[in-house]
Regions:
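Short hydrophobic targeting helices and cationic amphipathic motifs
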Residues: 6, 19, 23, 55, ...
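Cationic, low-complexity basic patches in intrinsically disordered or flexible, solvent-exposed regions
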Residues: 12, 49, 53, 74
């Protein structure tokens, strides 16, 4: 008699690739004891030599699966069908089947590359090499140039893949020396790297090649991190120490900078089981009240007026089957960032981008508005904790300005009179 102790994931979402097999077999398994976040299954098996050989064969196959994880789905199906047809001890068969189901869960738990890219403390470093003139002369949405990308990080050995690069954006594309970029990585290039399952990425870089160029990018990334505290549906970011090797007149000019990656909006849709809404004009009233108020309050907090839900300007729009959901992005024209090139919209009649204007609609549920106000107040400590994580990245004077800027927002939020004067009475429509 041998005792086999097997750990299987409890969460049903951990086994989407094998869910059909899992549902067929779960009822046939022995009773289980729940321990923490896993289910422990103890099975005593009287195994004949033949059964042990089958068990050994499957163990060898499992090792092969781990080594070559790309073929997991196909091989798991083959092993599953083979085991069903085996004439062996029923308990042994259960163990073998459960083993296959367990390892079917590995790509989602142990080998989830798309989550690895946006993991914390990755300390990602990368180098791109290209001719700026070649990149900048091809500015339409379908024209890319190729560049080698050398990268490394915590737990990531140095590797090189080929990426496709193009310029993106509007305002920064016109005025900046380093322009915002979009990266595309072919599936075969990304396989078995931290970039696996991340075919499209945005790359945010400093505007000009000058002293202190990184500070604006740190503040823009801070805005994304603020929003992570305020909405579970958000764009993930990953800081990156970037070196761009500029090819110019037969020379190589190196530029080192802080930058960050932004995940593709399709990843957000997949993660939350929602659909990306087409880029077309929409009625802001079709955006759910909670999402719209959150968007508008967040924009007010960071002093951002450079957005439009109707035209989906700096707005990613999704559909959950009932209402539209809006996610903000591109914050370089906000008062939080206070970029030297940022100019306020003359239609808003403000003298500086640091001057806040609430641009949300009036036709929203008052109870939802009141609830969102309380929610923001409850998140004050989280917001300042996030801000303090960037303290050593900003000049002392600039950090103090940003800190005071966010403090002033919460002062307005916590005062009934100030809230009514600056937000409720300023809503549109």
């Amino acid at each position: 008699t041998e005792k086999i102790y097997l750990m299987a994931a409890r969460e049903p979402l951990a086994l989407p690739r094998c869910s059909r097999a899992f549902s067929l077999l779960w009822n046939a398994l022995p009773k289980v004891n729940t321990r923490g976040n896993t289910t422990a299954i103890d099975i005593k098996v009287k195994s004949k030599l033949k059964d042990k050989l089958y068990l050994y064969a499957v163990q060898v196959a499992i090792k092969e699966i781990i080594t070559e994880i790309r073929v997991l789905k196909f091989k798991a199906l083959v092993y599953f069908l083979n085991i069903i047809s085996m004439k062996i001890n029923k308990q042994t068969k259960k163990i073998l089947l459960l083993s296959i189901l367990y390892f079917c869960s590995l790509p989602n738990n142990l080998f989830s590359q798309d989550s690895e890219l946006f993991a914390n403390d990755l300390n990602l470093k990368a180098q791109l090499t290209f001719d700026f003139k070649e990149l900048y002369k091809n500015t339409n949405d379908s024209t890319f140039i190729k560049s080698p990308m050398v990268f490394s990080g915590n737990g990531i050995d140095q590797d090189t893949i080929t990426v496709r690069v193009r310029v993106r954006g509007n305002f920064r594309k016109k005025i900046c020396y380093f322009k915002p970029m979009r990266l595309e990585i072919r599936k075969k290039q990304a396989e078995n790297t931290v970039f696996e399952n991340n075919r499209k990425l945005k790359l945010v870089v400093p505007c000009q090649n000058e002293k202190g160029k990184d500070e604006l990018i740190y503040k823009e990334m801070l805005a994304y991190k603020f929003y992570e505290n305020l909405s579970n549906i958000h764009l993930k970011t990953q800081p990156i120490s970037l070196k761009i090797v500029e090819l110019k007149n037969g020379k190589e000019i190196e530029h080192e900078m802080f930058a960050f990656l932004i995940e593709d909006d399709n990843k957000v849709a997949k993660r939350h089981d929602i659909k990306k809404f087409p880029k077309r004009r929409v009625s802001p009233l079709n955006v759910g009240d909670s999402s719209a108020i959150n968007f508008a309050l967040f924009s007010y907090m960071i002093g951002n007026t450079d957005w439009s839900m109707a035209y989906q300007h700096n707005t990613e729009m999704f559909y959950n089957g009932k209402k539209l959901l809006a996610i903000p992005y591109d914050f370089d024209h906000s008062g939080l960032v206070d970029a030297y090139y940022a100019k306020p919209n003359p239609m808003l009649k403000i003298s500086s981008v640091t001057e806040r204007v609430y641009r949300g609609l009036c036709r929203r549920d008052p109870q939802v508005f009141a609830g969102m106000r309380k929610f923001y107040i409850s998140k004050e400590e989280d917001i300042f904790n996030t801000l303090n994580e960037f303290k050593d990245k900003l000049d002392e004077k600039e950090f103090s300005r940003v800190n005071s800027y966010i403090e002033s927002f919460f002062s307005i939020l916590k005062s009934d009179s100030e809230f009514k004067l600056n937000i409720l009475s300023k809503c549109r429509g």
